[in-house]
Curated annotation (Swiss-Prot):
<dbReference type="InterPro" id="IPR046977">
    <property type="entry name" value="RsmC/RlmG"/>
</dbReference>
<dbReference type="InterPro" id="IPR007848">
    <property type="entry name" value="Small_mtfrase_dom"/>
</dbReference>
<dbReference type="GO" id="GO:0052914">
    <property type="term" value="F:16S rRNA (guanine(1207)-N(2))-methyltransferase activity"/>
</dbReference>
<keyword id="KW-0963">Cytoplasm</keyword>
<comment type="similarity">
    <text>Belongs to the methyltransferase superfamily. RsmC family.</text>
</comment>
<keyword id="KW-0489">Methyltransferase</keyword>
<dbReference type="Pfam" id="PF05175">
    <property type="entry name" value="MTS"/>
</dbReference>
<comment type="function">
    <text>Specifically methylates the guanine in position 1207 of 16S rRNA in the 30S particle.</text>
</comment>
<dbReference type="InterPro" id="IPR023543">
    <property type="entry name" value="rRNA_ssu_MeTfrase_C"/>
</dbReference>
<dbReference type="GO" id="GO:0005737">
    <property type="term" value="C:cytoplasm"/>
</dbReference>
<dbReference type="InterPro" id="IPR029063">
    <property type="entry name" value="SAM-dependent_MTases_sf"/>
</dbReference>
<keyword id="KW-0949">S-adenosyl-L-methionine</keyword>
<dbReference type="Pfam" id="PF08468">
    <property type="entry name" value="MTS_N"/>
</dbReference>
<keyword id="KW-0698">rRNA processing</keyword>
<dbReference type="InterPro" id="IPR002052">
    <property type="entry name" value="DNA_methylase_N6_adenine_CS"/>
</dbReference>
<comment type="subunit">
    <text>Monomer.</text>
</comment>
<keyword id="KW-0808">Transferase</keyword>
Length: 347
């Protein structure tokens, strides 16, 4: 089943006949595979690891699938070129200019840019957002509650440098001052959010192998290693920009950890002495609650004897029931008017 934006692309796929196509920020469907009905070849870059895992089993000689903030093994001066680049307009609007710059670096001169997105997702401002090296965006289709815009590469775009897309700032935590590197599209308030502050204010003493689930830009990871530098820390997230941010944050603080993508805990292995998280489960949507349920169930299985599990969660959502059902006895170590901090030790 194709998502609504993908269905709009299929409605307009004739313009891709025999093209070498690059799809950026694709969704959890098989649109890149479907485009092979008309395109000569398709490369697809997912910024969400779940989306990558959905498509990757279908890779073949004409369909290459990648995950990350950029295509791998690219010479900055000799990037691979495509006749058409399709961009799915990102949910995090600040990520859009990054994707347009990446698209421009991979287009042949006068190559075709297609941008698709849901009406409610910010794409209506596309014409204002397109950099000057692209022709004025033209509306090509309006269907399935989505818009499709087309443009072409008219000028030369700045070379892609990750450092151009990072904001770095100092953050005061209960563990001391840390440097945070935040790439576009990664959540940041440039101060400790209430949930993370609650967690860091009651950070347990840990040892051995510890997992930071949903690491984001690495705030918890850096604070944890500042206080307890001997930990063997692993940081996982589903978002490519978050993982790259976390790596930059750790490097800026002279710290090391294993940073890698994981869909839930599926890509982690073995058991942990500690699992710490401010998980991205705060919106109360059914799909998010399901992810939370899986995280709690899986993390219970991956906790060592005497291991410590501590997460902060929105007090108004039913995660306390999910957690209690899995762990039985657990403590609410602290709370504020928005969050509760849950603690469990595997005896």
């Amino acid at each position: 089943m194709l998502t609504n934006p993908s269905q709009v692309i299929i409605r307009n796929q004739d313009s891709l006949s025999q093209h070498k196509v690059l799809v950026l920020n694709h969704e959890a469907d098989l649109l890149p595979k479907a485009l092979l009905d008309v395109a000569a070849s398709v490369d697809a870059l997912a910024l969400d690891y779940h989306h990558y895992l959905h498509l990757a089993p279908h890779a073949n000689t004409k369909l290459r699938c990648y995950f990350g903030h950029d295509l791998p093994h690219q010479d900055p001066l000799e990037r691979e070129k495509y006749d058409t680049v399709i961009v799915y307009f990102p949910k995090a609007k600040p990520l859009a200019p990054y994707l347009f710059n990446l698209a421009a670096n991979h287009l042949v001169p006068n190559g075709q840019l297609l941008v698709v997105g849901e009406n409610k997702g910010g794409i209506k401002s596309l014409v204002k957002l397109l950099p000057e090296y692209f022709a004025t965006g033209m509306k090509l289709d309006n269907a399935r509650h989505c818009l499709l815009f087309g443009s072409s590469l008219e000028g030369s775009a700045p070379a892609m440098k990750l450092s151009d897309w990072v904001s770095q700032y100092q953050l005061t935590t209960p563990q001391g001052e840390i440097s945070i590197c935040n790439l576009v599209g990664v959540f940041s308030e440039k101060r400790l959010d209430l949930g993370t502050e609650l967690l860091l204010s009651h950070l347990p003493t840990l040892s051995g192998r510890v997992l930071d689930f949903g690491c984001g830009a690495g705030v918890i990871a850096a604070a944890l290693l500042k206080a307890q530098p001997s930990l063997s820390l692993e940081c996982v997230d589903i978002n490519a920009m978050a993982l790259a941010s976390c790596e930059l944050t750790l490097a800026a603080n002279g710290m090391t950890a294993k940073v890698y993508p994981s869909d839930g805990l599926a890509q982690t292995t073995g058991k942990f002495n500690g699992i710490i998280s401010n998980p991205p489960f705060h919106d109360g949507l059914a799909s998010t609650t399901s992810i939370a349920q899986n995280f709690v169930t899986d993390s219970a299985k991956q906790l060592q004897h005497n291991g410590i599990w501590q997460i902060v969660a929105n007090r108004h959502l039913p995660y306390s029931d999910i957690i209690a059902a899995e762990f039985g006895q657990l403590k609410v170590v602290a709370d504020n008017n928005k969050y509760k901090l849950y603690y469990f030790q595997h005896k």
